[in-house]
């Protein structure tokens, strides 16, 4: 292992605090868990300096940057870096490539706040490439098992019980179906990739060389499973989790009605929260309108509206079971049956929760 790789590995295995001095727009496109953004230049300043660099060259761009970030603005930014460094003496600073921006930030921090602080060699690019390589290497070197099963069997909860489980839905902050959007939205594609790679890295450090993932397909919401991993999973053996129809419906009611409504009410209050919960549920069904067909969609939409009206009036959620049962029976279960038939020979085990847990714990250390 190269020395730089050893340092990057240490950063992610030990959750080293990271100070990101890139512009906010860059940070939003992708960073690392726990990183804090205190930029050298804001988005507008970065845009101006970039134009100057392209038109007049580096010396003029540096001079413009010094002019834009001066006086009170400069003092404020140095104060933010100093506060981070004092709170996290074990941390590191990075910019895009470990170049001018991090050099300038560290020079100012040292000369005006008296703080010598280390930076990440190669910056964000080096950190990201290390994580991309981690996922690609795991896809080539490790064993994988896909956990499949009908909608509502509790696959995600089972993954959470496995030391070697990789929770794609957790990293994507999405439950994976048309109804899977969560209140606080999804991470960027880059952030999703980073979270997954760090999870793999930490589990490998604990000795795991085989992993179990839920059978999600190419996407979890708008997050795409990394190509190297997706190609590896297309050849992975499949374990199927089974449960009764009634238990599956109750689990879906708990996740998508009780739990989701509670999240919206906690965030927005009873009235607005229920209104937004209702809108989210109806919009989620609307995403399936074309696949369901006109008559079936209209019936489910009417049933959902009736269930929401009763829930709002009395708190009774029983009517939700009707549209959920119909949607599962007439849409999700046939779709699962079709997908299963398209992958003959890959299913290596089927059973209920205790049986599948025992099988995976015994065979996927």
UniProtKB/Swiss-Prot annotation:
Record has Transferase as a keyword: yes
Q: What is its EC number?
A: 2.9.1.3
InterPro entries xrefs: P-loop_NTPase, Rhodanese-like_dom, Rhodanese-like_dom_sf, SelU
Q: What does it catalyze?
A: 5-methylaminomethyl-2-thiouridine(34) in tRNA + selenophosphate + (2E)-geranyl diphosphate + H2O + H(+) = 5-methylaminomethyl-2-selenouridine(34) in tRNA + (2E)-thiogeraniol + phosphate + diphosphate; 5-methylaminomethyl-2-thiouridine(34) in tRNA + (2E)-geranyl diphosphate = 5-methylaminomethyl-S-(2E)-geranyl-thiouridine(34) in tRNA + diphosphate; 5-methylaminomethyl-S-(2E)-geranyl-thiouridine(34) in tRNA + selenophosphate + H(+) = 5-methylaminomethyl-2-(Se-phospho)selenouridine(34) in tRNA + (2E)-thiogeraniol; 5-methylaminomethyl-2-(Se-phospho)selenouridine(34) in tRNA + H2O = 5-methylaminomethyl-2-selenouridine(34) in tRNA + phosphate
Q: Name one GO molecular function term.
A: tRNA 2-selenouridine synthase activity
What are the record keywords, sorted? Selenium, Transferase
The active-site annotation reads: 95
The biological processes this protein is annotated with in GO are: tRNA wobble uridine modification
Claim: Transferase is one of the keywords in the record: yes
Q: Which residues form the Rhodanese domain?
A: 12-136
Subunit details: Monomer.
- Functional description taken from the UniProt entry: Involved in the post-transcriptional modification of the uridine at the wobble position (U34) of tRNA(Lys), tRNA(Glu) and tRNA(Gln). Catalyzes the conversion of 2-thiouridine (S2U-RNA) to 2-selenouridine (Se2U-RNA). Acts in a two-step process involving geranylation of 2-thiouridine (S2U) to S-geranyl-2-thiouridine (geS2U) and subsequent selenation of the latter derivative to 2-selenouridine (Se2U) in the tRNA chain.
Q: Which family does it belong to?
A: Belongs to the SelU family.
HAMAP family recorded: tRNA_sel_U_synth
User: Under which name does UniProt file this protein?
Assistant: tRNA 2-selenouridine synthase
């Amino acid at each position: 292992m190269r020395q730089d790789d050893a340092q990057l590995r240490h950063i992610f295995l030990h959750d080293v605090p990271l100070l990101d001095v890139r512009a906010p727009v860059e940070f939003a496109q992708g960073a690392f868990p726990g990183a804090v953004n205190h930029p050298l230049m804001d988005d507008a300043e970065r845009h101006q300096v970039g134009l100057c660099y392209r038109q007049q060259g580096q010396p003029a761009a540096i001079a413009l940057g010094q002019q834009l970030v001066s006086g009170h603005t400069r003092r404020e930014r140095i104060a933010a870096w100093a506060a981070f460094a004092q709170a996290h003496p074990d941390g590191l600073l990075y910019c895009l490539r470990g170049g001018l921006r991090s050099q300038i930030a560290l020079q100012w921090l040292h000369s005006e706040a008296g703080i010598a602080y280390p930076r990440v060699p190669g910056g964000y690019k080096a950190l990201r490439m290390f994580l991309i390589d981690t996922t690609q290497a795991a896809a080539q070197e490790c064993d994988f098992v896909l956990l499949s099963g009908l909608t509502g069997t509790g696959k995600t909860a089972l993954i959470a019980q496995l030391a070697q489980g990789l929770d794609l839905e957790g990293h994507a902050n999405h439950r994976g179906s048309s109804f899977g959007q969560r209140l606080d939205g999804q991470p960027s594609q880059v952030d999703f990739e980073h979270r997954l790679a760090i999870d793999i890295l930490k589990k490998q450090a604990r000795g795991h060389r085989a992993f179990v993932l839920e059978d999600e397909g190419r996407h979890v919401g708008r997050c795409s499973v990394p190509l190297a991993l997706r190609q590896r999973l297309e050849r992975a053996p499949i374990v199927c989790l089974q449960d009764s129809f009634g238990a599956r419906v109750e689990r879906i009611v708990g996740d998508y009605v009780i739990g989701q409504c509670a999240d919206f009410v906690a965030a927005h209050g009873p009235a607005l929260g229920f209104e937004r919960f209702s809108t989210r549920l109806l919009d989620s069904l609307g995403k399936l309108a074309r696949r369901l067909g006109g008559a079936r969609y209209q019936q489910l939409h009417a049933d959902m509206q009736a269930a929401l009206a009763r829930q709002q009036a009395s708190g009774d959620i029983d009517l939700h079971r009707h549209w959920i049962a119909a949607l599962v029976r007439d849409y999700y279960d046939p779709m699962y049956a079709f997908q299963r038939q398209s992958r003959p020979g890959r299913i290596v085990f089927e059973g209920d929760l205790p049986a599948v847990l025992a099988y995976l714990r015994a065979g996927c250390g």
